[in-house]
Amino acid sequence: MTSHVLALAFLLHACTALAWQETNSRSVVAHLDSGIIRGVPRSADGIKFASFLGVPYAKQPVGELRFKELEPLEPWDNILNATNEGPICFQTDVLYGRLMAASEMSEACIYANIHVPWQSLPRVRGTTPLRPILVFIHGGGFAFGSGHEDLHGPEYLVTKNVIVITFNYRLNVFGFLSMNTTKIPGNAGLRDQVTLLRWVQRNAKNFGGDPSDITIAGQSAGASAAHLLTLSKATEGLFKRAILMSGTGMSYFFTTSPLFAAYISKQLLQILGINETDPEEIHRQLIDLPAEKLNEANAVLIEQIGLTTFLPIVESPLPGVTTIIDDDPEILIAEGRGKNVPLLIGFTSSECETFRNRLLNFDLVKKIQDNPTIIIPPKLLFMTPPELLMELAKTIERKYYNGTISIDNFVKSCSDGFYEYPALKLAQKRAETGGAPLYLYRFAYEGQNSIIKKVMGLNHEGVGHIEDLTYVFKVNSMSEALHASPSENDVKMKNLMTGYFLNFIKCSQPTCEDNNSLEVWPANNGMQYEDIVSPTIIRSKEFASRQQDIIEFFDSFTSRSPLE
């Protein structure tokens, strides 16, 4: 009798301990803090994993919740289908084009995709180890993009025993409009990211994940967001390390200046025909507008200004609002904020080549001829007194343009100033402040079958923005007709990059002590980086005269006092 009771007790314990349950060969379910969700079994290269798609991680920010910090989910009673990706957030895509499949847009876009190694599904009393978790923040200039699989296929990583989470967050006017009020405080998109990380903490074990072993990562604006989160007091204890691909909190392609936020907000209200000055009335009119109208106004702003419109902002403390960015990122870095977070950061050899067609369509050359200050990186533009802007533009023109305004010259100045300089400078700053290791790379491998170049109609030399991402995430875009079988070297490079990333996710170093299959990658000393040229050519290099020249040139501007 006693043995039967013990057996029954053990069975009951096992059933309640199961965070996961395989219901049949075509679906799996997970028990979250808000209810049960049903996902789908999948496989890649003969290795099984499970995906839970379109999982809400907070109450949808519609109606009175527009612009506000996300609120907790209401629990649901029935099993929620998580078998399809949810709608993407409202946006105007000016870059990704055919890389992104046509998707429904909605304000109700707060969804995550969770991809889990098959071995992690049924966890009984810890017989399967908790897995490390990668939370990836998509790029898109804080204006467009999504966590969908078109650019972020999880196959390369989830089949190596890492849980991969991608997600949507509010973008452009919906995510980064700031009126400096409690109802429209700004940085809503960053708060969405913090909400997602808190949700992951609460539910990690339900997915077989280790809540104490979370890596955040991002590409472009997603990398900048990830770095900003490492500098925020609001994220303490939410993650362990960060990977920054082509973006930092110091990046020159955006500015956190409240001056810019005030300027862009004023432009928006003019386009919408809102002439009120009372913040409450402005909020009421913005809330009453259909989301489509706000999205159309944002599209007009993008056409007028370029890629970047609504951006993260240094915040003033507001009652009842979680502060994400409490000071200029460069000041926070100099003070040592975030220095104990291990970083893996990188840039490509010709970042801004990816934007070439967009710049041509934008008629950039004529716009520069009409207004030379356009060549000034946004961050510098709002650090410089207005009377000195033309002088600054001429200094940049002498350095990069040699008297000829051309797309080629802009691409060069953009690559150096927007991406390479911030990465080099962050490496220097980390060496000065001490703290956790930082690993820096330059990705210069020109793949034989670059899906990015094919889809976007590019034929440039060098490696542009986004191209390194395709060796870490599988591109599952609608442009399957343009996919070619990867070359032997392409496969080797995919294995190399995923190897570095997987090691960093597991041991905070690109090369772990218990994995000798990769060449040892030394931590940065403020003057060195790994130059990834091919799967067999990876060199540790000291900053050359070219890098030193880039640092000295842009340092000469940042030494000026920023505008208040």
Curated annotation (Swiss-Prot):
Keywords: Disulfide bond, Glycoprotein, Hydrolase, Serine esterase, Signal. The lineage of its organism: Eukaryota, Metazoa, Ecdysozoa, Arthropoda, Hexapoda. The keyword Glycoprotein applies. The keyword Glycoprotein applies. Disulfide bonds join 89-109. PANTHER family: CARBOXYLIC ESTER HYDROLASE. It comes from Heliothis virescens. It catalyses: juvenile hormone I + H2O = juvenile hormone I carboxylate + methanol + H(+); juvenile hormone III + H2O = juvenile hormone III carboxylate + methanol + H(+). It is an enzyme of class 3 (hydrolase). This is Juvenile hormone esterase. JH esterase plays a crucial role in the decrease of JH activity in lepidopteran insects, by hydrolyzing the methyl ester of JH. It is also involved in the transport of JH. InterPro entries: AB_hydrolase_fold, CarbesteraseB, Carboxylesterase_B_AS.
